[in-house]
């Protein structure tokens, strides 16, 4: 995931193509004329696209977009998308996990079922299953529910997405 500074740098590069007077601020008029040119003179589409941008990115509603406003919008939306995708992927992770390890099909893993996760070459970075059970078992009832698993998988995915990967 890009840092806020990297997002700002990318936005600056992108926005310069729309900033007709190169003052570091985009007006709705500059955006419209830039889009009109990029859309081969289609004024309807350029107007529609300008309206969408103005209504979503112009945080303080002054009719102008600073590079900072655009970068903040991009960073905020990137974070939301990561969280949404992590939530959806975690749900799939939970279903696969329960299908494999929930022997009594009660949508919870008791300690015996949970121990199966650590057997048979299952790839896990954790060696202390009691410690992991304590982390995941949020309500401390000795079982791991589907909701607890989903929260854990979601957190792992968000943590992973937040680290550099090169």
UniProtKB/Swiss-Prot annotation:
Record has Amino-acid biosynthesis as a keyword: no
A single GO cellular-component term on record: cytosol
InterPro entries linked: EF-hand-dom_pair (IPR011992), EF_Hand_1_Ca_BS (IPR018247), EF_hand_dom (IPR002048)
Positions annotated to bind Ca(2+) 1: 19, 21, 23, 30
Any one Pfam family match given in the protein's UniProt record, by short name: EF-hand_7
Protein name: Calcium-binding protein C
Binding site for Ca(2+) 2: 102, 104, 106, 108, 113
GO molecular function: actin binding; calcium ion binding
Covalent S-S links between cysteines: none
Compartments reported by the entry: Cytoplasm, Cytoskeleton
